[in-house]
Design a protein with these regions (language model features):
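Hinge/cleft segment of the Venus flytrap/periplasmic-binding protein
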Residues: 58-63, 74-96, 183-234
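Solvent-exposed loop/turn segments at secondary-structure junctions
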Residues: 17-20, 32, 58-62, 105-109, ...
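Hydrophobic alpha-helical
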Residues: 1-5, 11, 71, 98-166
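Extracytoplasmic ligand-binding site segments that recognize negatively charged/polar headgroups
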Residues: 30-34, 38, 51-111
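Hydrophobic alpha-helical segments within soluble ligand-binding/sensing domains
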Residues: 27-52, 66, 109-113, 160-164, ...
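Structural detector of well-ordered beta-strand residues that form the stable sheet scaffold
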Residues: 12-13, 53, 130, 154-156, ...
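Sec-exported extracytoplasmic/periplasmic mature domains
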Residues: 3-7, 40-48, 72-80, 117-125, ...
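Flexible loop/hinge segments that line or gate small-molecule binding clefts
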Residues: 1-33, 44, 51, 55-57, ...
Length: 234
């Protein structure tokens, strides 16, 4: 479908790339690098090591696949290789950390909560839960609260849901990796506006306009949330 679109008009992608679509460029973050940043938050929360489960909507899209692999490679102290892919369904062990499972919920919030609850029961020594999509961390917090495991099992997240940021303020979430969707939108419109005028100079040379991810913890969550409210007018 996207290849057909690309033949008929100016096509760019943002947030999640589709490199095989003949799009002119991708605007967003490096999801593999963001995954490694997420893994670094796990290491900071569990300096002595521990067991981890990753939660995500699905792995069929590049952003999810690359985030997950970045987390895994960071925890296993591997070198950078965005093309590497560890298939789910196997336990991955390093010197200090082990990834017990990757659980996919197909964007079903009830299923996401059920998977979190099941993980808490199935793995009584579970150390950390990592949520790769925006809705995952708040749902993980709900499951942990019901199980009386808040602060016992560490939570690391992605994106800037209010529940996630409040969790960081309350000490229930160790940290989250955030994107800059405001900048994504701004740069995408800027590029499309120039392309519509026939100006291709606006395109990045390698086809990727990198808008870096940021790591949010208790040290900077208040300032970040204030900035976010200003940008969104909330």
């Amino acid at each position: 479908f996207l290849k057909t679109v690309a033949k008929k008009t100016k096509l760019i992608t943002q947030d999640s790339d589709a490199p095989g679509s003949n799009r002119l460029c991708y605007v967003g973050m490096d999801n593999y690098e963001a995954g490694r940043m997420c893994g670094q938050l796990v290491k900071k929360a569990l300096p002595d090591g521990g067991s981890v489960i990753i939660f995500v909507g699905r792995l069929g899209q590049d952003n999810a696949k690359h985030r997950r692999q970045g987390v895994i490679d960071e925890l296993l102290d591997r070198g950078n290789d965005p093309k590497r892919y560890d298939k789910p369904g196997q336990v991955l062990r390093g010197d200090k950390y082990e990834i017990l499972d990757t659980r996919t919920d197909d964007f079903d919030f009830a299923k996401a909560k059920s998977l979190a609850q099941d993980s808490i029961v199935k793995y009584p020594k579970l150390s950390c839960m990592v949520g790769l999509f925006a809705y995952n961390p708040p749902i993980l917090l709900e499951a942990l609260k019901s199980a009386g495991k808040l602060k016992t099992i560490k939570v690391i997240g992605f994106d800037e849901e209010d529940g996630t940021l409040k969790g960081i303020q309350d000490g229930d979430v160790a940290g989250t990796i955030v994107q800059n969707p405001y900048k994504y939108g701004y740069e995408s419109v800027r590029i499309l506006h120039a392309l519509a005028k026939g100006d291709n100079r606006v395109l990045p040379k390698d086809g990727f306009l990198n808008i870096p991810a940021r790591s949010i913890t208790s040290a900077n969550v208040d300032a970040f949330w204030a900035e976010l409210k200003m940008l969104t007018g909330k």
